[in-house]
């Protein structure tokens, strides 16, 4: 890691830092104040440079760059529509198929989003755009939490060892791409990217060695840590669970100043050796805190100067909020940015807001954005599960960035510099406000993560809320839900929903079977009217089942997903599973099973899908 500036230069450096912050904040003001002009310019630039690519020529755009012609001619697409082109590029076709600039690599989407690992084309200059968005985060944050430049961030960041396509292009997760780039590895000294983890520990492909060495370095520099985090809330909690399991070995290393022999990566050992020194006093401190029966507030106990926890807690990650609050003593939970493999989108301009109020301001220069209106009635999503191809009328419904309406929900559609054209990202967003002319969105869910037996369609948000309602029955028994997933079991007729629950038991009071049956019913009562009609009237859906699994089951699930190629950095517990080996893994660790004891309430006359 670069050294900190000498003390005598701090005054000048602070002034420069303040000026840099003001420049970045001014850039946000300019981009959001001129959002529509910037969007027109972005589209014109993309279409001009890609005028001769095969995909645009096939649709007879003929070099035109105006927005109206673009909207009338170019179709709104999904991944399946361009999969043949993607495969040609992956197999080595270097002709300008999607982009006039060479495709430098493929970014693999998370294996738990929609169930497939998709290859997203990217070009070299996209790294500049990603870096630009990263550069906006801390100037925004410094408005709310001053002095962050005086310490370090303890972030648990990981890479996945990359693969190659048949044509020789790297295929890797977007964060692996960024961490392996010169933009990250050779970044100039910046107090805002001054981390406790040396680059070598982040770039270690062995997840155990990477986690161990990053945690050790974080403990050694515990007084310097001002902020902690990971990408997802689940990843940060996994780091704390790792500490719970391995603190004895970590304390031994700190006491002796000798790194565990289990860490075999030479570059990691060399990097850690520059930080790890014998410190019996620090070892005693860490041991004293970790030996306590309660781990409540462990983050603020071990890293006492921490100001906030920087993790994604929107969408289904919101279920981890109580656990984060427990470990952090209620520190602010900060979601800083919104990004995906397809494109980096926006930033949170109010980072200290409550997790339930997180909104992202889309930065108009990142890509050309359009929005497909989505209508949700009584919790049932309609157009988010539209057929792959939109009708001509639905294509005409798309609106531009500055034309979205407050409170309306939309599916995000992007046109990128790297060659995605009117591509449905699949994220459902709700407009919560505006920064000048640029809208701000809350993230609702990823589309198509649903349970379905018959005509019922239960989306991710509905499932999350139903589970949240059900677990209140566990509170009197000092029990909570650690993790969960689900699947639609159609091996019997009628089919039924199955939830796998892993519990965290703090008390000794046994939980009666009737309580879990009440949980089953509470989940069903929370579902939409179509589901309840299927249970009560149509008899097309059987009683919901909750299966309790052994502790550690969801760690096994993650390990299995990683063994198949999922990125540890991007991994999120899937809320719905369909892959038979995963269901077999979960079923092999079931300790108890409970069914809903009766049908949920349902009143006729509110049918969502009638013949009329």
From Swiss-Prot:
Its EC number is 6.3.2.-. Coiled coil: none annotated. It is an enzyme of class 6 (ligase). It holds the Pfam family GH3_C. Induction: By auxin. One of its GO terms (biological process) is camalexin biosynthetic process. The keyword Ligase applies. Keywords: Ligase. It comes from the Eukaryota. Catalyzes the synthesis of indole-3-acetic acid (IAA)-amino acid conjugates, providing a mechanism for the plant to cope with the presence of excess auxin. Strongly reactive with Glu, Gln, Trp, Asp, Ala, Leu, Phe, Gly, Tyr, Met, Ile and Val. Little or no product formation with His, Ser, Thr, Arg, Lys, or Cys. Also active on pyruvic and butyric acid analogs of IAA, PAA and the synthetic auxin naphthaleneacetic acid (NAA). The two chlorinated synthetic auxin herbicides 2,4-D and 3,6-dichloro-o-anisic acid (dicamba) cannot be used as substrates. Belongs to the IAA-amido conjugating enzyme family. This is Indole-3-acetic acid-amido synthetase GH3.5. It comes from Arabidopsis thaliana.
């Amino acid at each position: 890691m670069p050294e900190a500036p000498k003390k005598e230069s701090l005054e000048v450096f602070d002034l420069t830092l303040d000026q840099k912050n003001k420049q970045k904040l001014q850039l946000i003001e300019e981009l959001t104040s001129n959002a529509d002009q910037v969007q027109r310019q972005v589209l014109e630039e993309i279409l001009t440079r890609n005028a001769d690519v095969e995909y645009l020529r096939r649709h007879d755009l003929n070099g035109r760059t105006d927005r109206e012609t673009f909207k009338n001619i170019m179709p709104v697409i999904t991944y399946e529509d361009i999969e043949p082109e993607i495969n040609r590029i992956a197999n080595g076709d270097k002709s300008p198929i999607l982009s006039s600039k060479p495709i430098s690599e493929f970014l693999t989407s998370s294996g738990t989003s929609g169930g497939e690992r998709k290859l997203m084309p990217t070009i070299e200059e996209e790294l500049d755009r990603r870096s630009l968005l990263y550069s906006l985060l801390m100037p925004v944050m410094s408005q709310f939490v001053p002095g962050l430049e005086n310490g370090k961030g303890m972030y648990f960041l990981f890479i996945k060892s990359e693969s190659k396509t048949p044509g020789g292009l790297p295929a890797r997760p977007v964060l692996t791409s960024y961490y392996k780039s010169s933009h990250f590895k050779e970044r100039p000294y910046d107090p805002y990217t001054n981390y406790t983890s040396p680059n070598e520990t982040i770039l270690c492909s062995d997840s155990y060695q990477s986690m161990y060495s990053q945690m050790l370095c974080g403990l050694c520099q515990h007084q310097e840590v001002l902020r902690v985090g990971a990408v997802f809330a689940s990843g940060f909690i996994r780091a704390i669970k790792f500490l719970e399991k391995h603190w004895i070995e970590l304390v031994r290393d700190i006491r002796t100043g000798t790194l565990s022999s289990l860490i075999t990566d030479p570059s990691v050992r060399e990097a850690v050796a520059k930080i790890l020194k014998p410190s019996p006093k620090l070892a005693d401190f860490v041991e004293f805190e970790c030996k306590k029966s309660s781990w409540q507030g462990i983050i603020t106990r071990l890293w006492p100067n921490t100001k906030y926890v920087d993790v994604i807690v929107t969408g289904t990650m919101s279920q981890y909020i109580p656990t984060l609050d427990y470990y952090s003593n209620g520190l602010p939970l900060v979601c800083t940015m919104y990004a995906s493999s397809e494109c980096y989108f926006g930033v949170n301009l109010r980072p200290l807001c409550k997790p339930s109020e997180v909104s992202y301001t889309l930065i108009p220069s990142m890509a050309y954005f359009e929005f497909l209106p989505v209508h949700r009635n009584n919790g049932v999503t309609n157009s988010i599960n539209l057929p792959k191809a939109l009708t001509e009328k639905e294509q005409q419904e798309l609106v531009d960035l500055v034309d979205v309406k407050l409170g309306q929900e939309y599916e995000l559609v992007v046109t990128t510099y790297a060659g995605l054209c009117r591509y449905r990202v699949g994220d459902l967003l709700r407009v919560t406000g505006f920064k000048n002319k640029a809208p701000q969105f809350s993230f609702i869910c990823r589309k198509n993560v649903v349970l379905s037996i018959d005509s019922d369609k239960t989306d991710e948000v509905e499932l999350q809320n139903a589970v949240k309602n059900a677990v209140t029955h566990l509170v009197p028994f000092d029990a909570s839900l650690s993790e969960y997933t689900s699947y639609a079991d159609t091996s019997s007729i009628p089919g039924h929903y199955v939830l796998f629950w892993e519990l965290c038991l703090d008390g000794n009071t046994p939980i009666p079977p009737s309580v879990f049956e009440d949980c089953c019913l509470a989940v069903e009562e929370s579902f939409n009217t179509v589901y309840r009609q299927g249970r009560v009237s149509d008899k097309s859906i059987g009683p919901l089942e909750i299966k309790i699994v052994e502790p550690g089951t969801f760690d096994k699930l993650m390990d299995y997903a990683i063994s198949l190629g999922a990125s540890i950095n991007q991994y999120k517990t899937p809320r719905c599973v369909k892959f038979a080996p995963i269901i077999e893994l979960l079923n092999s660790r079931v300790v108890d099973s409970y069914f809903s004891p009766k049908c949920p309430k349902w009143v006729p006359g509110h049918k969502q899908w009638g013949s009329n």
